[in-house]
Amino acid sequence: MVDNKFFKILIENTFLKITSKNNNLVKRFRSFKRGSSPKDQDFFCIEGTHLIKELLKSGKNPSKILVTEKWLRKNQNLSKKFDESLINIVSEEVLASAISTINPDGIAALVEISAIPNYQFNRKDDFILVLDRIQDPGNMGNLFRTALAAGVNAIFLAGGAHPLGQKVLRASSGAVFHLPFLRFDGIEEEILSSLLKSLSELSNVGF
């Protein structure tokens, strides 16, 4: 049963519904829809209830949220986990215009990239997977999901698709949030040099 008192406060007293597709926050979400690379941003975008749940399960929190009234009605308990100041109610049409999901289920969020920690070189018994220039986002996401199920502790990425890109996140089913990773960018020689340096650091801690 919906807590009508909670919902009334949520809608009437706390938030201002966004109905314009030209709203600045909506435009910011839309920039990720156009394919902006997460490596050039301070934030990345996640879409859908499942990824939101996985983000929270991993101990991380969103910075900005777009959500429909319908979603709030259906997910009252989950919505209570968010700081009210982060929530921005939008119409279903506005949400659909802002994100890449064809049939969005009612929620999307921006997350600070700094909230996703890099791997720390302090454990000699870690199980580390090294991926060399995996370009296909679907394959990258599947590898993250499989690695998590297999007990991998961290992933080193020598270029390739960015793990915080939309297609990788969807394919990983949120596994990216649970696996620390290091990504090495640049020309081939720079990537190899950075990777070898990191492997050397592992050796120094007894790996």
Task: Indicate where each model-derived feature is located.
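RNA substrate-binding interface of SAM-dependent RNA methyltransferases
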Residues: 57, 88, 116, 121-207
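Short, structured interface segments
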Residues: 106-116
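Short active-site oxyanion
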Residues: 40-43, 61-64, 85-86, 153-155, ...
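Short, hinge-like loop/turn segments at secondary-structure boundaries
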Residues: 81-83, 107, 171-176
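Short, aromatic/basic amphipathic alpha-helical patches
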Residues: 73-84
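Glycine/small-residue-rich loop that forms an oxyanion/phosphate-binding "nest" at active or ligand-binding sites
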Residues: 87-108
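Boundary-proximal intrinsically disordered activation/regulatory segments immediately upstream
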Residues: 6-73, 160-161
